[in-house]
Amino acid sequence: AIPSVNELLTEWPVVKAAGETCDAVVHAAVTAELDEERAAIRAGAAPRSKRDLASAIEWRAHRSALPSLRPAVNATGVVIHTNLGRAPLAESAAKAVAEVARGYSTLEYSVDTCSRGSRKEHAAQLIRSLTGAEDALVVNNNAAAVLLVLATHAAGKEVIVSRGELVEIGGSFRIPDVMAASGAKLVEVGATNRTHLADYEQAITPDTAMILKVHPSNYRIEGFHEEVGSRELAALAHKHGLLFYEDQGSGALLPDDILVRGGEETTPASVSAGLDLVSCS
């Protein structure tokens, strides 16, 4: 007969596992192991002894209690790999994080005024210095930034985007879906491979809130192709009293020869070009 849950909970390996993890983890391990045991017996396998079941439960409990986030070896050939944590922290940066995280900190306290401060200011002041922007805000990722920008500045209003920039990025980030979630109204202009300045201007109505330019990220259109640059779109938006917002995708804070050869703009360059809003990750 299959041992009961109570019987297994008194076995030493299970008792030991409960002391090293917690009761909830052990109870879940017992339930899962018994479910597997019943399925195996129905399939014709011989029943395991109580001791074997207890050892299996101990192993399962310890395994389920392990952190799911752990170091990995990146052998993919992709240096900045989204699924593997993107850019590793420098040793000095990791040390600085650990130094602050192991105790109390001035997260939301201003030493200058001896009063409550702003938790966003720590990163914001650094980003302002790096980019020349008037202000900055750090959120979870660029997808969150896009949603927040659209919901804040264009909910219930129209946002003009080129058809060739209605991209889908890994993790099911799709521009039309994010637009719908924000409450903004998507206005597609141009063709998939060619969009002209006149296409944007002709789409402007009294309900237009902004013009959006989206970086295509890991795909490109080649051959018979044309797109409008950010500076031209910013000038058009300002001519009509609209906001111009550039979703840079990954973005880059510092210039790099490879980026320059690829025709990529850095975030500081976009800010200095007069763009109203820029987001990147």
Write out the residue ranges for each language-model feature.
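Glycine-rich phosphate-binding segment of PLP-dependent enzymes
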Residues: V30-T31, D35, A75-T76, R86-D112
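Long amphipathic alpha-helical segments
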Residues: A1-S64
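Conserved PLP-enzyme active-site core in the AAT-like
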Residues: C114-S281
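Long amphipathic N-terminal alpha/beta scaffold segment
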Residues: A43-L89, A93-V97
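Short glycine-rich or small-residue beta-strand-to-loop segments that form or flank ligand, phosphate
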Residues: V79-N83, S110, I160-S162
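Short, flexible active-site-proximal loops enriched in glycine and acidic residues
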Residues: S64-A75, Y104-C114, D135-A136
